[in-house]
Curated annotation (Swiss-Prot):
Extracellular face of the membrane: 22-782
Places the protein is found: Cell membrane
PANTHER family associated with the record: LEUCINE-RICH REPEAT RECEPTOR-LIKE PROTEIN KINASE FAMILY PROTEIN-RELATED, MALECTIN DOMAIN-CONTAINING PROTEIN
UniProt-recorded name of the protein: Receptor-like protein 46
Organism from which the protein derives: Arabidopsis thaliana (Mouse-ear cress)
Amino acid sequence: MSKQCLLSCFLFFCFFIPQLSFSCPQDQRQSLLEFKNLLIHNIKDNYTAFEELGTWRPNSDCCKWLRVTCNASSPSKEVIDLNLFLLIPPGLVSSSILRPILRINSLVGLDVSFNNIQGEIPGYAFVNLTSLISLDMCCNRFNGSIPHELFSLTNLQRLDLSRNVIGGTLSGDIKELKNLQELILDENLIGGAIPSEIGSLVELLTLTLRQNMFNSSIPSSVSRLTKLKTIDLQNNFLSSKIPDDIGNLVNLSTLSLSMNKLSGGIPSSIHNLKNLETLQLENNNGLSGEIPAAWLFGLQKLKVLRLEGNNKLQWNNNGYVFPQFKLTHLSLRSCGLEGNIPDWLKNQTALVYLDLSINRLEGRFPKWLADLKIRNITLSDNRLTGSLPPNLFQRPSLYYLVLSRNNFSGQIPDTIGESQVMVLMLSENNFSGSVPKSITKIPFLKLLDLSKNRLSGEFPRFRPESYLEWLDISSNEFSGDVPAYFGGSTSMLLMSQNNFSGEFPQNFRNLSYLIRLDLHDNKISGTVASLISQLSSSVEVLSLRNNSLKGSIPEGISNLTSLKVLDLSENNLDGYLPSSLGNLTCMIKSPEPSAMTIRPYFSSYTDIPNIERLIEIESEDIFSLVVNWKNSKQVLFDRNFYLYTLLDLSKNKLHGEIPTSLGNLKSLKVLNLSNNEFSGLIPQSFGDLEKVESLDLSHNNLTGEIPKTLSKLSELNTLDLRNNKLKGRIPESPQLDRLNNPNIYANNSGICGMQIQVPCFPTQTKQPAEEKEEEDKEEEETIFSWNAAAIGCSCGFLIAVVFMSYNELWK
């Protein structure tokens, strides 16, 4: 028995007691467990946190926990690093959750980046973290200003507060961080001047303040930071000149000052930056003067040069100097380039991105440029002429080609089928002839823009497995049937202003991702009901104006639940308007940014730099829509035009009463029912069209008075009611009172009102109910008059008889 007891004691001391001894300090373990409990309490279903913090158990050594690092060389085994990167899933938590871990004063590194922490940074809790060397709080929702307590962390070498919503200013106390090597404050709301005290941070290697609200000038003290390798101040409001002594920063590899308000010239000292690899000065409209090529061509390590959007700068290479660098990216868009495409590009064999658009370049597309292994070529908005070299499309490296708005001519080469392009824009040139059938063999073509040329014939059929998402062939001379064969992912089909004819194809119902279909100004026939039945509910914009469609609009129109723009004007439609028009979901509620934006289509192509912005710049017509607005055809050109909601059924033969259900379309901005045969009253429900800006009901047979409810239309700035049979007083409201052009009410039965300076008489101002009441009253008065007359006559007769009888007796 005693042996068993001794054995039990031995096992207890061997196995159980060691489990109670921990390497990390007890108070630090408790702080970590408190943080874990707060996190689990605040975030439900936090599978990431539950899994990764599963090792954080009360009866275990915190030095063995995931995301925790202890000082193995110290006897106390204190926690020195916490890596909480991407721990918290979607769902905001308060910054107070950090308080427990900020009590661990032995921390050297703390990373809470890419979480969903909101609120002010708890500055007071950082006071005791005097050993902290690296602090990463990037990519959260911290707000308020940078707490001054952070500037007391004098051992700090890396401070990253980027991608939050921090405001306020950057204090001059930043000078206290003498050991700081990286200061990263990108994408916040920090404003004011960059403090001159920043020049005291002599150990600084990286200074990135991109996308804030800094103003004033770049402090000259920056030139004292001779160890700097990266300066990124782009997308602020910085003004004045680039410091002349910027050339002192001889270790600089990246200088990015783009998208500010800088002025003056590019300082000559820039040629001293022999280690410079990236120079970005684009979109500073105040920069002026010449760009001496000799300064830049001596920068042997330069790989990225972006000067676009500085239309006051003039490129000068009069010395015909050839560069010593090998660029990978070059953008001189809108830099005053003239003459032929520069010859010095011949030796830029490493070039993958070239943008020389919006200049005054002339001549032909050089064969040597087609031979370079460039991925992205943008030469739009120049004066280039001639035909395209066939070898241009035989380079497997070419992914992006934009030649829009030049004077290129001739036929599109048959070799186009050998290309690997994803984005091809040849719009607004003088290309003619037919489109080669080989174009359908381009394996990964995503966007094709051939609009505004003189192309003719039938458009080729794409294969069902095509990746084509965006097609614009509008404003050409194509004929034959409407193209019907595209890949299943097609979302944009812009085919207006051609000579397409015949009925609408059956297989459009396979385009389940179709968002915009524009076929206006063609010769398409058939019934509108058949056409609408072919469309997916994903369609947001449907423009079929000026075709030969017939029949009535079907009740099934309401199945197009995403529809925001419907233009069926200038066709041969007849019949009544279906009440289901009032059930178009996206015209009832305010529209939001949709898949019509660039991002969903091209965000995955990371090998094409800035493709979203480039497409946005080069494909302006994609964002335009011609509508009948303000009594004429007008172009809605707006990056946000997809926020418009529009219903245009004008110039048809529609008849009957206007359904009151149209008043449900509360987000409608443009409503045009003009030039039809509508009759009856203007619906009172039109007063509920609270967002409407343009209302055209002219050239119909509408009767009655203008509803007083229209006085509620506070956004209305265009109204046309002429050529109807309306009468009575024009309702008064601040908005309607401004619409005082008599022409918008012309040719009606008897409209009056102060807006058109026509006085209203009592008989003109009675509402229908009042008129009925007046008629009933007159009828009652008439009956009363005849009854009174009859009673009077009867009484008179009786009196006469009595009098005569009495007179006889008297005799």
